């Protein structure tokens, strides 16, 4: 049993799985994995399948897909082709777009019993580490790629992560394997290719053990990051509100470094891209510490950081719904715009709304400007703007809260109050938020 195959088998023996899925690009690393997998399947009876992702970026993409299918047929392995389209005009790097698209189409193939195999090797790890270093990353970025990690409903494994490209190519030549060569790999305009051709050879010639050193550093960074996240998880429980906001008072208790890490953990909790160090400072200085009478907001990518009642909130940019209106037919669900869910006026004994004589005059709006109401239990009408403030509705939600109207009069504001003139027991207004089946 040769060294690489032994290493491969030992890697897989460490983890539980019932099925193996190989991400097959057709390059030398994935072709070596294919050969190792076929050998392991014959020896151990593994259930193995391959998936090739067709990015459509190269004029040779169709040929690569056919080549991967042919190679799999030769070893008796099923191979599925997944096609993706990349928005190359988005401004994002093609490398990032392609990587995200690959993971997106691979995910449905990975259930709880599946182990996804990826072909990244020690030279890829070195490049990833250097790219993170170039960006000024902390422990999370410098941890680079994990050898084993959760993915979709199962896990992924990079069994060649400690093996050099030179060793992989030597194995491929020794076993007379063939592979495709992506012509874009020679284009040093791409950062990773620049490192591969211009930087890594110099580093490895000067320090032959640098791959192993980088791998150790990456593992140490991953360990430090895991410990940090364990600590932050407890701190975040204290800082985060039931509505998902972040307490400014709790942030103020900690050091600058602690505050910065809590803000980043808050973003991670909401599954949003990490803010940079500069952005965390702006969140604190421009939003959290803004004057009491201000309504501060900071836009970061496709999200806004807002402040309300001594807490920070992450909200999507406000959409103008002032011109939207629609009739509301009792017992029928009304779809609301911008993913705000559905409304339904439901007959219910013991409800809180009196049904008007002519229900065809009922309609829904999001525009509170100029409207007044008197909630049940109060005396005298007030502007909706004032009522929103009294009910503690954040400014960004005030024009995203449905208002039920009858002709030109406010019947109720969803989830807040019913006007006293419309108090009754005929029906109730139910707001199904975010397309949930259960009203919130």
UniProtKB/Swiss-Prot annotation:
It is found in: Cytoplasm. GO terms for molecular function: ATP binding; tRNA(Ile)-lysidine synthase activity. GO terms for cellular component: cytoplasm. Signal peptide: none annotated. One of its GO terms (biological process) is tRNA modification. It comes from the Bacteria. Its main location: cytoplasm. Pfam families: ATP_bind_3, TilS, TilS_C. Keywords: ATP-binding, Cytoplasm, Ligase, Nucleotide-binding, tRNA processing. It is an enzyme of class 6 (ligase). ATP binds at residues 25-30. InterPro entries: Lysidine-tRNA-synth_C, Rossmann-like_a/b/a_fold, TilS/TtcA_N, tRNA_Ile_lys_synt, tRNA_Ile_lys_synt_N, tRNA_Ile_lys_synt_subst-bd. The N-terminal region contains the highly conserved SGGXDS motif, predicted to be a P-loop motif involved in ATP binding. Ligates lysine onto the cytidine present at position 34 of the AUA codon-specific tRNA(Ile) that contains the anticodon CAU, in an ATP-dependent manner. Cytidine is converted to lysidine, thus changing the amino acid specificity of the tRNA from methionine to isoleucine. HAMAP family: tRNA_Ile_lys_synt. This is tRNA(Ile)-lysidine synthase.
